[in-house]
């Protein structure tokens, strides 16, 4: 079974979000199941030179893009037993950021065409082409509409994964006409047209043999208007080929037993070492070293989606509790400034790190007691999974993957691995925080809750099995 992942980012090469984590970890787990997964992505100038040096030139071809042919170098390399192909074109990929350029429509039209033009020149036969998010959605669409009659492509099946429906790749019609050479028959509501523009993600949804969302709850949510980003009707139409498969975490990277970034390694039977991580975190930020004061942390993009309006509304009420708060992340200036002001107002209780620091993030996960994630929507979420693996109990809103992975503690049965609330309401969140703090001070209950969190399986194993079955169903 040969699978080609077409992605715009992938760990360890480049990362801007959770897509890169999925593209880096899922293929490794699928390989353990006997699936040959290879990955194709742009050869960005942002890729570390050491990784670029590990690739060799496999082939040079021309890619037709509208009225012209564009250079395409196919580089080939291997990392952790996985084969990678990098599409080389400095005009499109020698940039100071992955996305957000005036010509993104052209850049990813080129990449989509390049993926398809490369397939006959790769040294393996593709059974399933698996595209991800808007950046490679048109690979699947173009395969069906322009390449399917070619014997080299006719047996290839397609899967399309929606990681975040909010970002759809919407561009002027000229992209479709001039670059992709698609005529008027594609510019209507049953094809690519979307409120006067062209929508790449819509093309992926329409053309793919199977569609997955990154959690079962998110799969249901995106079929409703509130979460559907104007594509809910289309997703309801194609419900029969839509499924939800929850993401996992790479346990070779996020594992408190082996993590070299944290002060003291530990497992569910050596939680006293977790306390050492808490002290180290307090020392790092200059917080009072108070063992019985819970640390509530957030490692997040500071954006509206992450529920920060709820946090902002009741933050001073949270501060009335005996707690310490640590926020690590960057994003919208209004939230950055708010948390910096709170750190100034509560210097003994609040610390903020604007930016991202991988090593510090690991220490925050290991040293905190509670992890706050009150998202407005959350397709899957990785933060809560990492927190659970480190025995840091999540407080989440019941949406998307948060609803699938965090099960609210039930004091009657003792079951659960975290705390959750349903409505997007600041005082519902505050009540849940109070409840979590109350149980934090009941040490036997808390220790049991932490052990339950740490002993569940958050790896990619079950998800990889589900993807393998999906691929298998397409090939039968």
Curated annotation (Swiss-Prot):
What GO molecular functions are on record for this protein?
Answer: alpha-1,4-glucan glucosyltransferase (ADP-glucose donor) activity; alpha-1,4-glucan glucosyltransferase (UDP-glucose donor) activity
Pathways involved = Glycan biosynthesis; glycogen biosynthesis
**Entry EC no(s):** 2.4.1.21
Keywords linked to the UniProt accession: Glycogen biosynthesis, Glycosyltransferase, Transferase
For the ligand (ADP-alpha-D-glucose), the binding residues are: 15
Q: Which GO terms describe its biological process?
A: glycogen biosynthetic process
Q: Which reaction does it catalyse?
A: [(1->4)-alpha-D-glucosyl](n) + ADP-alpha-D-glucose = [(1->4)-alpha-D-glucosyl](n+1) + ADP + H(+)
Fetch the SUPFAM superfamilies from UniProt. Answer: UDP-Glycosyltransferase/glycogen phosphorylase (SSF53756)
Q: Which domain of life is it from?
A: Bacteria
Q: What is the recorded function of this protein according to its Swiss-Prot or TrEMBL entry?
A: Synthesizes alpha-1,4-glucan chains using ADP-glucose.
Q: Which HAMAP family match?
A: Glycogen_synth (MF_00484)
Q: Which family does it belong to?
A: Belongs to the glycosyltransferase 1 family. Bacterial/plant glycogen synthase subfamily.
**Name by which UniProt lists this protein:** Glycogen synthase
Organism of origin: Bacillus cereus (strain B4264)
């Amino acid at each position: 079974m040969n699978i080609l992942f077409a992605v715009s980012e992938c760990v360890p090469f480049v990362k801007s979000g959770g897509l890169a984590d999925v593209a880096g970890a899922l293929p490794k787990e699928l390989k353990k199941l006997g699936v040959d997964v290879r990955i194709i992505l742009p050869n960005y100038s942002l890729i570390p030179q050491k990784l670029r040096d590990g690739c060799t030139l496999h082939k040079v071809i021309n890619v037709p893009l509208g009225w012209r042919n564009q250079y395409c170098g196919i580089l080939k390399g291997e990392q952790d037993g996985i084969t990678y192909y990098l599409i080389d074109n400095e005009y499109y990929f020698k940039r100071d950021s992955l996305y957000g350029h005036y010509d993104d429509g052209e850049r990813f039209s080129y990449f989509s065409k390049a993926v398809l033009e490369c397939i006959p020149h790769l040294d393996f036969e593709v059974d399933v082409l698996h595209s991800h998010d808007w950046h490679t959605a048109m690979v699947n669409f173009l395969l069906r509409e322009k390449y399917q009659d070619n014997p080299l492509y006719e047996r290839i099946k397609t899967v399309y994964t929606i990681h975040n429906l909010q970002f759809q790749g919407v561009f002027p019609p000229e992209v479709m006409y001039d670059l992709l050479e698609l005529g008027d028959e594609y510019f209507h509501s049953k094809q690519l047209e979307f409120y006067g523009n062209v929508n790449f993600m819509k093309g992926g949804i329409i053309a793919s043999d199977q569609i997955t969302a990154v959690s079962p709850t998110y799969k249901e949510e995106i079929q409703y208007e509130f979460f559907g980003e104007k594509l809910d009707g289309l997703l309801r139409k194609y419900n029969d080929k839509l499924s939800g498969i929850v993401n996992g975490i790479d346990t070779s990277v996020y594992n408190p037993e082996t993590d070299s970034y944290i002060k003291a390694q530990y497992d569910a039977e050596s939680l006293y070492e977790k306390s050492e991580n808490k002290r180290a975190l307090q020392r790092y930020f200059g917080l009072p070293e108070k063992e019985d004061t819970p640390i509530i942390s957030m490692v997040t993009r500071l954006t509206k989606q992450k529920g920060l309006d709820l946090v902002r509304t009741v933050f001073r009420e949270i501060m009335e509790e005996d707690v310490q708060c640590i926020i690590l992340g960057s994003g919208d200036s209004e939230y950055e400034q708010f948390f910096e002001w709170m750190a100034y107002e509560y210097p003994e209780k609040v610390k903020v790190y604007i930016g991202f620091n991988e090593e510090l993030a690991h220490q925050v996960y290991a040293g905190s007691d509670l992890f706050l994630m009150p998202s407005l929507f959350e397709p899957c979420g990785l933060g809560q999974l990492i927190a659970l693996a480190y025995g840091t109990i999540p407080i989440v809103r019941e949406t998307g993957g948060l609803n699938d992975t965090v099960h609210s503690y039930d004091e009657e049965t003792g079951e659960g691995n975290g705390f959750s609330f349903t409505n997007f309401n600041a005082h519902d969140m505050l009540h849940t925080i109070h409840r979590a703090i109350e149980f934090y001070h009941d040490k036997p209950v808390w220790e049991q809750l932490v052990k339950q969190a740490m002993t569940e399986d958050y790896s990619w194993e079950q998800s990889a099995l589900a993807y393998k079955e999906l691929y298998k169903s397409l090939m039968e």
